[in-house]
């Protein structure tokens, strides 16, 4: 079952500056806790679930008597426009090795420079999870060799991470929910991508150096369903905050699971195994389920579960050994000599914390408890900040209307059904994309008139006020293409990603009023002539 988090919550937070590095001897030793080993010294915490004891079973034990223990390590790409230590763009789907700065390729003489926006977004995620965001953090080198790691080391935050502690409320299904403790959040640079050819290994460094935030959880999860639900909840939070897109199919969110088993009475406990690089929620659930079957079978036969790193094959649903972890790898962690500590000023920390929106789980609980909404309806409304804000505005207007009319009381459940039903349906039919401020004033009268016809009328007014006529859009597109000869040459030379530059410039010149799909169609016609 999920355990109640008792992690401490802090208040200060962030914009960054870099100051003189600490002397090597002054950097504190790495913390001993992880998502799946050792005991926690944090006050109020329960002992770790994983044990180094390997005891053989002296009597047959049914599968139902075994408890699965799972911790997660999530690697999420931060949505900053450029990479963590270089100015190269972070763009999925670009031509191989098109977005590579000298530092990303480890060229001699190139030096890292910290991306302040990436640090700010990581701090935002830390505050949202209730973590203790550190005003001072530092980077380390983690040494290992792989074709897609040109430096021969990864820059990470082993000793002094950006945030410690925190928790996340996880809803699994009706009647099953709880709180998952977070151990730490740390910034690190991503690796490149390697692929096997017939007689060689091909390396694409576009991803190398992208900002990752690694989220390490406590081993509080108890099975495949909870592990998958927790990962999905993290994805929703990352997207909700605008920290990143967390698209698992694109590799911008990858999950490792640490799995071990013990008898429910604690008499028999096995070692943990780590299953790496799971890229879908279904794969997470299947990997944990397979490890349950495999590990329990070993323990019931009185055999050891060896501490291993394993891979998962989605075609077979089975895991396989990548490497044995009985002898721990020596990553030779050392302070990063080319980067001073990251210092987040108190005023900036406070500003970032103040800007963190109410999380979906918190909003759903509030709507259920104070507005009396059904849990499922509350979760639907709480899934987007704009929907929550609009429901709150509608509820406030409904209360004001009730006050003016004396005896009439508007049921908040009716307001919620109207927002999620009539309004959302009318928005989809009208083809209006709401981006925040546009449309707020024209729709202010909606709470007093729940009719679909009235909604359609007002949305049509919004669409008319925020869209461009076809002639003006065509003229703008032509002007943009004419003003960007280098991008035009690149596109005609096969660099199709230049299309994004044209569309972006159109949106900039029209202040967001253009339809980007229509703009792309017009531009394609122009550049293909």
UniProtKB/Swiss-Prot annotation:
Q: List the record's Gene Ontology CC terms alphabetically.
A: chloroplast; glutamyl-tRNA(Gln) amidotransferase complex; mitochondrion
* Keyword list, A-Z: ATP-binding, Chloroplast, Ligase, Mitochondrion, Nucleotide-binding, Plastid, Protein biosynthesis
Which Gene3D superfamilies does this chain map to? 1.10.10.410
A molecular function annotated in GO for this UniProt entry is:
glutaminyl-tRNA synthase (glutamine-hydrolyzing) activity
Top-level taxon = Eukaryota
Output the Pfam families linked to this UniProt entry: GatB_N, GatB_Yqey
Main enzyme class = ligase
InterPro entries xrefs: Asn/Gln-tRNA_amidoTrfase_suB/E, Asn/Gln-tRNA_Trfase_suB/E_cat, Asn/Gln_amidotransferase, Asn/Gln_tRNA_amidoTrase-B-like, GatB, GatB_Yqey_C_2, Gln_synth/guanido_kin_cat_dom
SMART domains xrefs: GatB_Yqey (SM00845)
Compartment(s) of residence: Mitochondrion; Plastid, Chloroplast
What is catalyzed by this enzyme? L-glutamyl-tRNA(Gln) + L-glutamine + ATP + H2O = L-glutaminyl-tRNA(Gln) + L-glutamate + ADP + phosphate + H(+)
Predominant location category:
mitochondrion
Which parts of the sequence are annotated with region: Disordered? 17-61
Question: What intrachain disulfides are recorded?
Answer: none
- Give GO terms for biological process: glutaminyl-tRNAGln biosynthesis via transamidation; mitochondrial translation
Enzyme Commission number, as recorded: 6.3.5.-
UniProt xrefs under NCBIfam families: gatB (TIGR00133), PRK05477.1-2 (NF004012)
The entry sums up its family as follows: Belongs to the GatB/GatE family. GatB subfamily.
Summarizing the function annotation, the protein's role is: Allows the formation of correctly charged Gln-tRNA(Gln) through the transamidation of misacylated Glu-tRNA(Gln) in chloroplasts and mitochondria. The reaction takes place in the presence of glutamine and ATP through an activated gamma-phospho-Glu-tRNA(Gln).
**Known partners and oligomeric status:** Subunit of the heterotrimeric GatCAB amidotransferase (AdT) complex, composed of A, B and C subunits.
Query: Remarks, anything else?
Result: This protein may be expected to contain an N-terminal transit peptide but none has been predicted.
Name of protein: Glutamyl-tRNA(Gln) amidotransferase subunit B-2, chloroplastic/mitochondrial
Which organism's genome codes for this protein? Micromonas commoda (strain RCC299 / NOUM17 / CCMP2709)
The gene name on file is: GATB-2
